[in-house]
Structure formats: structure tokens, C-alpha cells
């Protein structure tokens, strides 16, 4: 007994534990359910559609897709039937039935929407003799019952139209076997009777380009609008499916005598003959709803409830539904007539009443007569010809009515009209609105993963100049569009597209050229507005497809496509690479197809602008140079050449990069100025520092406080024209002795007749005569009173106009100081081909005129003040670069009316070179003695020091700039108008001559033959 009681107690304990666990589980389930309900109820408005709504929308889309596929298949079969028998023309007949009483009418849905309500897709025809439920039968009048025609019922839902296809007993022998039947879907009949899928008119743009970061609720609201064909605009639309009149197009096949098809001879039935619409039992059973699975039926049931609720709420606001009623209507007859006439008549036969169909209730004031059968499918609409006299005689009044209806309702979706073509896709811009926009090509280097398009467009509103949306295209798509436009606009001049091979090149000049040609092409199209309808509609469709969303910004300071190459690849024009560049912090990353190929540290880097020269051998356009600073010194810096697609884009990159680079003139430390450093050159150091190349005078901010020397006369007199300046300059230079001295061979110019002009002694009578003649001529010309320009003036006059201190002990003209300042700050001494490559001639001329008028121009900040007018963004010669500044310095030196060391000292230097022969050491020592003797004016010594120090630094960086001693002598010997054997020691022994250093033991020999020297 004890054991039994213990067992009972243990069993009761386990049962209670199980019950407690079940209670806890149920409590957990209830809490989870309440939590889910709270989440759905609280966040439904913010989190977007619920799962059930998404499922319903998915089911709806799947059904629409299936219906469209069946419709396409039916159209293909119809086309094949029409192609197989072209001997028959189409006759379309209509029967106008009296309008039923408003009390018994019901607002019927569009055919496709009505099908959705009943969740059935079976509108196939049953074979002859097949039993059909009485509810699906059409009411047949006694007159029809005695007509002797066999009736084939068309199975539809109770809410949809019920149609009987009649044929005479004479045609029974032409029935096809069940194997040759054609299954026709509901969508095919919907197209014939007014399918809303072909009646879409996007009167206004209802799809907006939204950012991908918007909420799901917004996306859901726009999801239905983004459907390609099933969106209908029912508000005030002239062809809305809710405004269909009680007239419908009907079909009847009635072969004419002598033109009846013989199926045995023809091998098949004629197009749209009764044989082509006979259906077998298997086909009928195949579409029965009972074949659907239980899951499908459940989903369709839910979808049916949703559609019923939606349409009841929209179409019947009062909540009451009228009982539907039927009106009797006839089945028109398709007659096979000779195909060569290609004509059909729209006639009404009062004797052809066959059946009734439910029609929608519409406002009598807004009713519009139905359009005729689509002319695109059954031929053009016209009155009957002599071959159709019988049909024409049967319905003459209705022919006039039909013609009137066609002319008035050409905008119907069933007519072959322009407006019906608007239903292809939703349009962001309507054809009639093309005159209010402009299309701009943003980039031809656009790349998006998974998208082959490489050309990015922007559609901008003309009035507000604001961007509406973007879209991307491939060149193939653009070429196809161009072919269509030219076929439809043969009489209009449309500029050609860029050649396809231009899109295979990455040379910046070609990239800019193809972008400009595309801009011209689309600008010309819009300029011709209003365009013919077909081209206008095609253009509207072209810009409304392949939209591009604006990316989410904020992660990088700047990002975009750039053309890049390094300095080591400058020998070839095929080395430009497309890179996606991003600036993150002080690092610039270069990506190639999502792979990080290069990383540039922007700290202490420098930026240079490149002029847009039409003859640039590297094809540079909208370019700039980024010199990456290395810790080991400037000699190991890396130079990157970048090119943007537009000047505006380059300015954006420059503005971002300059704030991140701490180059010369930026936050880099500047050495202090002391007496010792003032007396020495910056380049006594073994390596180039990060500070300005101007050395101790690099503290330009402090020096700006020292105003440049200006003449006392506030209104200096200048020449009236540039031609007069050039004439006077030539007249002055014609008096100097080195132009007229006799030729005597010298040790350094043996065998070089061109260099022997410097062999004349200064003690010779010729020289004395020339000097006296020069003085008298200069005094008689009184040039000083007239010539106050910088270029062409002597050194003393130029210093009086404007000057700047250099190295704390020299005074040099402002034009020389500004050019040296720009070259040192922008690492011009490392620029490849400096002083040999020419800059923008127009910009050099402009800078010369500014210096002549203002005497001092800040070249370092010149580009910040450049203003570009709209339309001139790509014009060359707008921005100052290294080659432009070096060309400006050469122009000033070339226009000096005297030698750089003065005309009086020329013969002294010449005798030293002749006396010492090949001994470069003695030549350097005697040059130094002459410079320090005081016989050469201090202004000449200052200019010599500044210029020759620059040339020394260029030779020290010859491995980067490719300008060795020989190349510099080739450039500056004619520029300074002095022979090479005098110029050479100033560069090779600069330290000995100007800085009291020991001379070089054996200087590098220079053997140059310069014609004119």
C-alpha cells in the first residue's frame, strides 16, 4: 500500500510539473504574440508594408505576369495565322444597343480586373456540344434560336462578359480536329474588348527618382506605380476603362462565296476562321480551376478578398453594390475578303444580334463612343470598297458613324494612334515637355558594378536649373536611338555621334571630345523642339529608362572617376588609366574595379595645374599634378598626373586636395632668418627641405608687408599699341655692339663662325664708335620718358616700377621675383622639360600685359581669381602652370634691351674666356673677381644671382626634369643673347663666383653648336 501511494504521489507530481510547463509555454506564446502585435501595430506606419501585404502584392504581380505571357502567346499565334492566309480582309461590324435603365446598371470593372475578382483565368471556348451550366449560358432570343446557327459558349466568370461565337451549319465540315485547336487566354479577349493593359496613358509622371536610403513605406507606395503596363490613370483620362461605353467590338467569321478556304487544299484553316477557335475537351479541362493546388486556391482566395475590398472601396463608396444586368448585343462577323485591298469596313448589322453582355455604368455627359478594332492588328480602318458592296449596303449609316468614331477617338488605346504608344513605359518627362529640359552628359567614364553602361546623363530643368534625375546608357543603346531618330527625321540636321573607337581610348583629349559631341547631339535634338511625335516619344522613353540613383554621400571628402598616369609613363599616350579615386582623411585611394591600386599621402604634397593646350603631346585636358612627398626627401617624391572630365570637376578636386596638402606655403615650418643664412644660398644643404625653394626669403607672408617700389607718378605714360613697343625694342637692340662686331676666331669657338662675333676687343675703334653711337641714339630717342612698361625696359627702370628683396641682400624686379616664387613653390625645378616646353601663348601674353600695367602680379594666387563664364569651361589658357610661368620669365629676359650683366661688362667676360682657354678653374676665379670688383652694377649682379641659382637647381634635378647643363645652355644662350662659353661657367661654378667657394677642378665640357650665336 505504501508503494502504491508513493507511486500515486510521484505520478501526481510529474503531472503537475507538466501542467506548469505547459502553462509557462502558453504564457510565453501569449506574450510573444502580444509583443509581435505591438511591434506591428506600433511600427507599421514607419516600417513599411506588412508581410501579408507583400505576399498579396507578390501574388498580384505573378498573376499579371502570367496573364501577359498568355496574351503574348495568343498574339504570336494570331500573327502566324494572319501571315499564313493573307487572302482575307477584315470587316468589323458593330451593333448599337439601347442603353439599359440606370437602376439596373452596374459599374463594371475592366475585363482584367473582373477576372481578378473571381480568381479565374479560363476564358477558353468549349467545343461544340459541350454542356455548359445554365448560369454561364447567354440568353438567346427566339429569333436567334430559330436561326439555325450552332452556338459555342465562351466560359467566363459570372462577373465577366458572356459571349457566344456563332457559325453557320455549312461550316461544320471545316471543324478542326482537337489536335489543331488553339488555346486562347482571357487576356487575348481582354485586348479585343478593351484591355486596360493597352490603354495606359501616363499623362503625368508618377514615378520619382528616390534615394535608396528612404523608408520602405515610401517604396511600397511607389511599387504599384512602377509596374510596367498595368498602371491606369483613371482621373479625367479620355480612355479610362471606367468610362467604356455600352458599345463593344464583336467578331463573326463569314466566308464569302468563292473565297471559302478549303482546309484539305490549304493544309489548315484560314486566319480567324471558325476552325481556328475550336477547342478540344482536353484544352477545356486543362484550364479548370479544380486543377489548382490547395495552396494556390488559398492564395487566390486571399487575393480575391483583397481585390473585392479594394474595388468596392474605390468604385462603390456607399458600400452598396448594384446587381449586374445584361444587355443584348451581337457578334460581329469577320469576312474573308481579298487581301490585296487591305481594307476593312466598320458596319452595323441589325440582324446579327446574338447575345447579351454586362456593360459599365457611366455618366452620360462623359461617355465616349468605343473605338474600332485595333488597326494595327486587323488592318487600317476605311470604308468598304467595291468588293465589299454587300456589307456596305447592309449598314451604310453605321459606316458614317464608325468613321466619325474613329476620327474623334484616335486617342483610344485600341486605335493606331500616337497617344496609344505612351502606354509602353512610365515616362519621367512627357514628349510635349521636352522643351522644358536639357540633357547634359556628366561622364563618359561612369562605371557601376553589374551595369555595362558607361555614359552618365543628367536631365536638368531649364527654368530652375536643377537636376531632375540621372540615367545611364551604353554607346550601343545610344547608337540604336540615333538610328531611329535619323529614320524618322531625315529632313532635319542632326549632328553625328562620336565614333565608336573614341570610347576605346582613355586619352583625356578624346574623352573630352566624345563628351562634347554627345552634348552637342542631344542639345541639337532639344533645340529642334517641338519634335515630330515619334522621335519625341522615343526620346522621352530613352531618358525615362535606366535611371541612376544618387549615391549616399558623406563617407568620403571627395570621390569620382579620374584619368591617372605616373611620370615614368610619360613617353606613351596609351598609359592613361581610369581610376575611381576617393579622399578619406589625409589619404587618397585609387581603385581599379574595387581593388585599391595606389595610396597617396596628401600631407606635405603639392599640387600643380596644367594648362589645356591643343597641341599637348600627352593629350592632357583639365589636368593637375599631385607630387607625393616622401620622408627621404624631394628627390624621391612620386608625381601623379590626373585629368578630370570637366574644368568644374577639376576645380572641385583642387579645392578639396589643397585643404589637405601641407606643401610649401602651407603649414610646413619655415626656417628663421639670420645673418649667416642671408649670406648663403638655400641649396648649400645636402637635400631639399620642405620649405620654400626661395630659402630665407620664403617667408612670403612677412615680406608681403613690404610694399613694392612704385614710381612717384601715379599715371605713367604707356605706349598706345603693342606694335610700337616692339618697334622701339628692336631699335634699341640694333645699337648694341655684339650685333655688329667683326668675326674673329676664339679658342672656344674655333670652327664656329656663328660664335666668333664676340672676339672683338673693347679697345677697338669699332667698339668705341658703336658705344658713342649708342649713347647718342638713346639720348635722342628719349625712351625713358615714354617707356614705362616692365617688358622691354632696362633693369634700372624696371626696378623703379616694382621690385622685391631676394635673399635679404638683393633687389630684383617683381616679375622675376614672382616667377621664381611660383616655380619654387610648385616644384617647378622638377617639372619635366621646364624652360623647354612652352606654356599657353595667350596666357603668357595676358600676363605680360598685366605686368606692364600693374607692375606686380601675384602668380601663386592667380588661379584662385580666375572666373570662368558659362560655355567657356573648356577654353585653354585660363590657369597658370609651370610651363606658362617659365615662358613668362624667358620672355622678360629676351626683351631686356641689354645683357644680363650689362653691355659694358660683356667685353671683360669675353677677354677672360679667351685668355684662359680651357682652364675652367681660372675662368671661374677671374669671373668672381670681376663680379666683386664693383665694375658691374649691383642690380645686374642681383639678377645674375637669382637666375643662375635657379639654373643650378634645375641641373641638380636633371634626372627628374630631363634638363641637363647642355639643354639649359641650348635654351638660355639665345634667350640671354650671350655665347655658351660665357654662360657655361656661371652655371657650373656658381658657388665659386657668387658664394666664395672653391672652384671646380674639371668642369663638364659642353660642346654645342647654336646657329645665331
From Swiss-Prot:
Entries under Gene3D superfamilies matching the protein: Phox-like domain, Pleckstrin-homology domain (PH domain)/Phosphotyrosine-binding domain (PTB), Rho GTPase activation protein
Residues of the site described as Arginine finger: 836
GO CC aspect terms: cell cortex; cell tip; cellular bud tip; incipient cellular bud site; mating projection tip; plasma membrane; site of polarized growth
Region annotation Disordered: where it falls in the sequence: 90-197, 258-277, 282-301, 307-421, 702-726
One Pfam family in the UniProt entry: PH
Residue span, Rho-GAP domain: 799-1013
Alphabetized GO MF terms: GTPase activator activity; phosphatidylinositol-3-phosphate binding
UniProt superkingdom: Eukaryota
Principal localisation: cytoplasm
Protein keywords: Cytoplasm, GTPase activation
Record function comment: GTPase-activating protein (GAP) for CDC42 and less efficiently for RHO1. Negative regulator of the pheromone-response pathway through the STE20 protein kinase.
PANTHER family: RHO GTPASE ACTIVATING PROTEIN AT 16F, ISOFORM E-RELATED (PTHR23176:SF129), RHO/RAC/CDC GTPASE-ACTIVATING PROTEIN (PTHR23176)
The protein's name in its UniProt record: GTPase-activating protein BEM3
Species annotation: Eremothecium gossypii (strain ATCC 10895 / CBS 109.51 / FGSC 9923 / NRRL Y-1056) (Yeast)
Amino acid at each position: 500500500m505504501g508503494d502504491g501511494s508513493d507511486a500515486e504521489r510521484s505520478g501526481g507530481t510529474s503531472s503537475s510539473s507538466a501542467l506548469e510547463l505547459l502553462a509557462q509555454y502558453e504564457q510565453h506564446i501569449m506574450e510573444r504574440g502580444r509583443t509581435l502585435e505591438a511591434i506591428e501595430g506600433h511600427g507599421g506606419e514607419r516600417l513599411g508594408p506588412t508581410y501579408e501585404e507583400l505576399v498579396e502584392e507578390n501574388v498580384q504581380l505573378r498573376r499579371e505576369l502570367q496573364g501577359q505571357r498568355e496574351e503574348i502567346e495568343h498574339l504570336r499565334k494570331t500573327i502566324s495565322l494572319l501571315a499564313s492566309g493573307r487572302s482575307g480582309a477584315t470587316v468589323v461590324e458593330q451593333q448599337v444597343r439601347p442603353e439599359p435603365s440606370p437602376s439596373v446598371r452596374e459599374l463594371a470593372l475592366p475585363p482584367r480586373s473582373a477576372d481578378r475578382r473571381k480568381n479565374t483565368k479560363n476564358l477558353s471556348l468549349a467545343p461544340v456540344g459541350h454542356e455548359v451550366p445554365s448560369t454561364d449560358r447567354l440568353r438567346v432570343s427566339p429569333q436567334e434560336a430559330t436561326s439555325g446557327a450552332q452556338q459555342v459558349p465562351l466560359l467566363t466568370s459570372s462577373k465577366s462578359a458572356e459571349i457566344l461565337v456563332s457559325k453557320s451549319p455549312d461550316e461544320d465540315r471545316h471543324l478542326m480536329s482537337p489536335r489543331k485547336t488553339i488555346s486562347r487566354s482571357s487576356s487575348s479577349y481582354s485586348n479585343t474588348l478593351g484591355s486596360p493593359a493597352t490603354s495606359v496613358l501616363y499623362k503625368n509622371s508618377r514615378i520619382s527618382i528616390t534615394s535608396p536610403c528612404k523608408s520602405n513605406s515610401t517604396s511600397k507606395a511607389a511599387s504599384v506605380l512602377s509596374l510596367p503596363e498595368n498602371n491606369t490613370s483613371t482621373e479625367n483620362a479620355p480612355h479610362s476603362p471606367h468610362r467604356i461605353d455600352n458599345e463593344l467590338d464583336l467578331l463573326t467569321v463569314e466566308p464569302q462565296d468563292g473565297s471559302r478556304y478549303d482546309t484539305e487544299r490549304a493544309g489548315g484553316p484560314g486566319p480567324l476562321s471558325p476552325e481556328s477557335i475550336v477547342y478540344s475537351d482536353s484544352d477545356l479541362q486543362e484550364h479548370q480551376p479544380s486543377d489548382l493546388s490547395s495552396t494556390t486556391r488559398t492564395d487566390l482566395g486571399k487575393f480575391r478578398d483583397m481585390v473585392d475590398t479594394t474595388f468596392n472601396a474605390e468604385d462603390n463608396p456607399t458600400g452598396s453594390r448594384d446587381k449586374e444586368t445584361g444587355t443584348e448585343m451581337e457578334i460581329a462577323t469577320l469576312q474573308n475578303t481579298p487581301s490585296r485591298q487591305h481594307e476593312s469596313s466598320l458596319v452595323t448589322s441589325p440582324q446579327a444580334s446574338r447575345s447579351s453582355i454586362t456593360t459599365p455604368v457611366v455618366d452620360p455627359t462623359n461617355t465616349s463612343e468605343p473605338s474600332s478594332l485595333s488597326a494595327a492588328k486587323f488592318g487600317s480602318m476605311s470604308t468598304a470598297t467595291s468588293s465589299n458592296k454587300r456589307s456596305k449596303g447592309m449598314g451604310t449609316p453605321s459606316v458614317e458613324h464608325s468613321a466619325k468614331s474613329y476620327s474623334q477617338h484616335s486617342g483610344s488605346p485600341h486605335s493606331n494612334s500616337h497617344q496609344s504608344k505612351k502606354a509602353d513605359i512610365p515616362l519621367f518627362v512627357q514628349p510635349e515637355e521636352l522643351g522644358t529640359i536639357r540633357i547634359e552628359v556628366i561622364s563618359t567614364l561612369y562605371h557601376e558594378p553589374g551595369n555595362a553602361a558607361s555614359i552618365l546623363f543628367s536631365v536638368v530643368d531649364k527654368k530652375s536649373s536643377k537636376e531632375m534625375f540621372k540615367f545611364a546608357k551604353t554607346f550601343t543603346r545610344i547608337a540604336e536611338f540615333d538610328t531611329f531618330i535619323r529614320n524618322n527625321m531625315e529632313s532635319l540636321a542632326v549632328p553625328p555621334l562620336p565614333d565608336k573607337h573614341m570610347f576605346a581610348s582613355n586619352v583625356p583629349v578624346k574623352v573630352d571630345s566624345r563628351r562634347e559631341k554627345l552634348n552637342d547631339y542631344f542639345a541639337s535634338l532639344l533645340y529642334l523642339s517641338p519634335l515630330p511625335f515619334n522621335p519625341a516619344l522615343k526620346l522621352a522613353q530613352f531618358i525615362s529608362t535606366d535611371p541612376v540613383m544618387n549615391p549616399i554621400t558623406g563617407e568620403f571628402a571627395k570621390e569620382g572617376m579620374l584619368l591617372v598616369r605616373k611620370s615614368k609613363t610619360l613617353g606613351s599616350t596609351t598609359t592613361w588609366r581610369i581610376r575611381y579615386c576617393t579622399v578619406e582623411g589625409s589619404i587618397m585611394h585609387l581603385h581599379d574595379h574595387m581593388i585599391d591600386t595606389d595610396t597617396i599621402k596628401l600631407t606635405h604634397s603639392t599640387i600643380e595645374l596644367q594648362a589645356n593646350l591643343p597641341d599637348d603631346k600627352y593629350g592632357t585636358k583639365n589636368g593637375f599634378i599631385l607630387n607625393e612627398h616622401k620622408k627621404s626627401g624631394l628627390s624621391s617624391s612620386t608625381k601623379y598626373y590626373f585629368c578630370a572630365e570637366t574644368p568644374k570637376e577639376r576645380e572641385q578636386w583642387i579645392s578639396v586636395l589643397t585643404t589637405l596638402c601641407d606643401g610649401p606655403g602651407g603649414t610646413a615650418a619655415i626656417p628663421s632668418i639670420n645673418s649667416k643664412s642671408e649670406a648663403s644660398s638655400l641649396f648649400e644643404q645636402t637635400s631639399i627641405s620642405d620649405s620654400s625653394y626661395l630659402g630665407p626669403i620664403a617667408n612670403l607672408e612677412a615680406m608681403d608687408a613690404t610694399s613694392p617700389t612704385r614710381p612717384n607718378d601715379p599715371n605713367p605714360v604707356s605706349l598706345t599699341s603693342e606694335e610700337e613697343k616692339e618697334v622701339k625694342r628692336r631699335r634699341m637692340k640694333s645699337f648694341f655692339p655684339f650685333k655688329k662686331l667683326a668675326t674673329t676666331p676664339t679658342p672656344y669657338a674655333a670652327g664656329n663662325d656663328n660664335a666668333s662675333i664676340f672676339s672683338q676687343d673693347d679697345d677697338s675703334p669699332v667698339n668705341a664708335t658703336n658705344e658713342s653711337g649708342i649713347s647718342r641714339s638713346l639720348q635722342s630717342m628719349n625712351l625713358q620718358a615714354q617707356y614705362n612698361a616692365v617688358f622691354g625696359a632696362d633693369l634700372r627702370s624696371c626696378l623703379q616700377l616694382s621690385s622685391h628683396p631676394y635673399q635679404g641682400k638683393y633687389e630684383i624686379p617683381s616679375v622675376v621675383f614672382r616667377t621664381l616664387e611660383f616655380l619654387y613653390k610648385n616644384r617647378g625645378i622638377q617639372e619635366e622639360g621646364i624652360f623647354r616646353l612652352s606654356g599657353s601663348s595667350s596666357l603668357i601674353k595676358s600676363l605680360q600685359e598685366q605686368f606692364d600695367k600693374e607692375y606686380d602680379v601675384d602668380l601663386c594666387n592667380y588661379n584662385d581669381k580666375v572666373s570662368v563664364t558659362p560655355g567657356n569651361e573648356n577654353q585653354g589658357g585660363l590657369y597658370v602652370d609651370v610651363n606658362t610661368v617659365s615662358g613668362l620669365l624667358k620672355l622678360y629676359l629676351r626683351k631686356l634691351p641689354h645683357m644680363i650683366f650689362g653691355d659694358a661688362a660683356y667685353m671683360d667676360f669675353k677677354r677672360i674666356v679667351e685668355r684662359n682657354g680651357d682652364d675652367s678653374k681660372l675662368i671661374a676665379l677671374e669671373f668672381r673677381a670681376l663680379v666683386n670688383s664693383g665694375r658691374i652694377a649691383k642690380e645686374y649682379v642681383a639678377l645674375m644671382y637669382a637666375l643662375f641659382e635657379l639654373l643650378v637647381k634645375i641641373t641638380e634635378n636633371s634626372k627628374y626634369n630631363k634638363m641637363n647643363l647642355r639643354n639649359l645652355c641650348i635654351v638660355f644662350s639665345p634667350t640671354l643673347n650671350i655665347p655658351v662659353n660665357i654662360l657655361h661657367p656661371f652655371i657650373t661654378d656658381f658657388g665659386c663666383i657668387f658664394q666664395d667657394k672653391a672652384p671646380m677642378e674639371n668642369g663638364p665640357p659642353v660642346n654645342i653648336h647654336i646657329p645665331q650665336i
